Amino acid sequence: MDDLMLRIRSRFNTTLVTQQEAIRFLLRKYRSNEQFLVGFISDQRPNSQNLHNWTQFLHQDTAFAVGGEEIGKHVNAHYFFLHVEKPRRGHYVMTFKEVCPQDDKTKFPYTLQYLRMMEENIRKQPELWLWSHNRWKFNREGKAIH
């Protein structure tokens, strides 16, 4: 499965960067003054060592990762959500929508707004979300639920 995902995600002249390499890679790109677009796969749960930030998501107490927002602050990023629709079999319509927080008094306003947008997208077409990555594996105490 990893090889398949790597092959799919590395088409069209894209560069895949591991989580460990991300900050150095992005700072290098930013300092070079060249324009670039970065996509984070942000719908998955954080690992058990990063269960610090929680919100309600799909009526569940849910941990969320904030790395994309934290890194974005260092490179003066604009944040976008990739809205996906499937009008018919084999056809997908993808639209970039700017993430504009409604409440920027929270600690991670862009991440929380992104989660609201993702939740809306999932509610409209739940069959498009990959449910197999066990989003709710841990509780707030870091204990495995399942």
Label every model-predicted segment:
Residues M1-E21:
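Membrane-interfacial amphipathic helices and adjacent loop/beta segments
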Residues Q20-H146:
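Non-catalytic C-terminal accessory region of glycerolipid acyltransferases
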